[in-house]
Amino acid sequence: MENTATKKKSKLCEVCNVSRPVLKRPKTGEMICKECFYTVFEDEIHHTIISNNLFKRGDRVAIGASGGKDSTVLAEIMTLLNKKYDYGLDLFLLSIDEGITGYRDDSLETVKRNQEQYQIPLKILSYKELYNWTMDDIVKEIGLKGNCTFCGVFRRQALDRGAVMLKANKIVTGHNADDIAETVLMNLLRGDIPRLQRCVNIITGSEGALPRSKPFKYTYQKEIVMYAYFKKLDYFSTECIYAPNAYRGHARDFLKDLEAVRPSIIIDIIHSAENFHFREENKMPVQRNCIQCGYICSNDICMACDLLKNLNSGLAKVKLSINLKRGKDNNNNSNNNDNNNTLKLESTSAATTTTTTVSN
């Protein structure tokens, strides 16, 4: 009789001990019911927002909205928490149309439906409008190799410009724990110490551009998918048709292999990167304004203007490989600590101090 009672008890939610569990949390391994999952998921993100002082009352916050699961859940969570905890924020949806036929045009329809559901003002800004190029045009010009370089640079600038048009003073994006762990791995594998230094920051852009925050920094992608599924949220699930050629895909596959062996690896990587201590010479360069467009950058001309110049001159395909090589060489020159091109960084914890050496 006692064994039967214990068996029945073990099948109950480990949080409320009342309802039957519907999932095992990837983040903690807890067997949890649907309502408790909603509660802990939302409470953890609220804690991240409050403990990191991401917002203050009266902020005008642009939510980067692509129509995908991350940005759709972000819109849901920001709307819900803003009302529940009276953040006092003015929220906006900001979508960037890169001009990818069969992908972005379809996902924008999802964003429009989200706008109607959440009753949040929506701004759509296109690459064509800003740069007179679409990503389809760029891929035709340069091919599939390196196209993510153009898209990443243009998208970051477009988000800032769109936020300014909305008179927003902050941007939030749906980057989750998996994304950040992947970025840490990418920067380690490339020996990109300046980017490694800032990629785990929950707020970026505070040096001049609009501050961007990541409320999902400690939120697993699998839990975001589960939240969207159980809440029956309307989101677009097709991957970008050019994404399979991105370098990030290799880091993602590597991370999945690691996670299969150690489920906590995602958070472990983030916490490890947070504890890195960098030498002074690895600091990011001083920011200034681009002499052509006025955008924040570290050179006289920002990368977006440089890429546009190459596109408009018909030399983008040739110069892309040159620029990428030059960027790698500059990174090596500014970050190498000896003549053997070895990058050194220190990781500290309360118990130990270790030195990690990454060779180019």
UniProtKB/Swiss-Prot annotation:
It is found in: Cytoplasm. It comes from Dictyostelium discoideum (Social amoeba). It comes from the Eukaryota. The keyword Transcription does not apply. Gene3D superfamilies: HUPs. Its EC number is 2.7.7.-. Belongs to the TtcA family. CTU1/NCS6/ATPBD3 subfamily. Keywords: Cytoplasm, RNA-binding, Transferase, tRNA processing, tRNA-binding. One of its GO terms (molecular function) is tRNA-uridine 2-sulfurtransferase activity. This is Cytoplasmic tRNA 2-thiolation protein 1. Residues 327-360 are annotated as: Disordered. Pathway: tRNA modification; 5-methoxycarbonylmethyl-2-thiouridine-tRNA biosynthesis. The gene is ctu1. Plays a central role in 2-thiolation of mcm(5)S(2)U at tRNA wobble positions of tRNA(Lys), tRNA(Glu) and tRNA(Gln). Directly binds tRNAs and probably acts by catalyzing adenylation of tRNAs, an intermediate required for 2-thiolation. It is unclear whether it acts as a sulfurtransferase that transfers sulfur from thiocarboxylated urm1 onto the uridine of tRNAs at wobble position. One of its GO terms (biological process) is protein urmylation. NCBIfam families: TIGR00269 family protein (TIGR00269). HAMAP family: CTU1 (MF_03053).
